[in-house]
């Protein structure tokens, strides 16, 4: 299992909400073309201007396809809203489930 995590800090809660509404409308359509991929978005009440997105992939090819879709469809919005962005990509090394 592979993952990619984006943590974006926006100047305001409103900009974060706007960005998440863009993600909701775009990804609900775009993700259909890449089966077996999981997208989750998280926010907390304590820091509502921070959006965390976690992608999970079963293989490197799916990850590559999503990264291209991000470049083609999402980067223009992050360039306009200009959040501070941190990202992480990696392979799962441990997994526990109860």
Residue ranges and their predicted role:
Residues 1-72, 79, 85-98:
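Short S/T/G/P-rich N-terminal loop/turn motif that feeds into the first structured element of a domain
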